[in-house]
Amino acid sequence: MAKKKKKVDENNSVLATNRKARHDYHIIDTWEAGVVLLGTEIKSLREGKVSLVDSFATIDNGEIWLQHLHIPQYSMGSWTNHTPKRTRKLLLHRNEIDSLMGKVRDGNRTLVPLKLYLKNGRVKLELGLAQGKQDYDKRQDIKRRTEEREVTRELGRRIKGINA
């Protein structure tokens, strides 16, 4: 009996990633948080229009808020459209919020959004506890990546030379 083909699930897809955050910060730990959104924001997200650049999370009165997440207005929306850069509430369990509060207060750490995605039809945000990198750390990462790339390239050449 043949196996069923897997369908591409529109309810589980990545909407945006914050590549700059992984470049500028050491990611210490990650959490999954729900995002409170309006109807036109969801529709705009499903069109793939979102920018995580320069966004961050803050903790106020025991609640986590996402700042500077840019979701453009929905093209088919009318007067009910949302403001593109409004502050959005993140949904986490109380014990997770309390542990995050302690970790952010301890040192020079911040909460950075890493990825925005759909999970079972709900918008989720991968939130990272991050510590800023120095310039020399960034240079070391670039050097390490180029060395790894050269090694894999050389291995590929040698394997092709042996098999050819």
Curated annotation (Swiss-Prot):
Q: Which UniProt keywords apply?
A: Cytoplasm, RNA-binding
Secretion signal span: none
Q: Where in the cell is it found?
A: Cytoplasm
Q: One Pfam match, by short name? A: SmpB
Q: What cellular component GO annotations does this protein have?
A: cytosol
List GO BP terms, alphabetically: trans-translation
UniProt entry tagged with the keyword Cytoplasm: yes
Q: Give any GO molecular function from the UniProt entry.
A: RNA binding
Q: Which HAMAP family match?
A: SmpB (MF_00023)
Job of this protein: Required for rescue of stalled ribosomes mediated by trans-translation. Binds to transfer-messenger RNA (tmRNA), required for stable association of tmRNA with ribosomes. tmRNA and SmpB together mimic tRNA shape, replacing the anticodon stem-loop with SmpB. tmRNA is encoded by the ssrA gene; the 2 termini fold to resemble tRNA(Ala) and it encodes a 'tag peptide', a short internal open reading frame. During trans-translation Ala-aminoacylated tmRNA acts like a tRNA, entering the A-site of stalled ribosomes, displacing the stalled mRNA.
Which protein family is named in the record?
Belongs to the SmpB family.
- Please state what the protein is called: SsrA-binding protein
User: What is the originating organism of this protein?
Assistant: Corynebacterium glutamicum (strain ATCC 13032 / DSM 20300 / JCM 1318 / BCRC 11384 / CCUG 27702 / LMG 3730 / NBRC 12168 / NCIMB 10025 / NRRL B-2784 / 534)
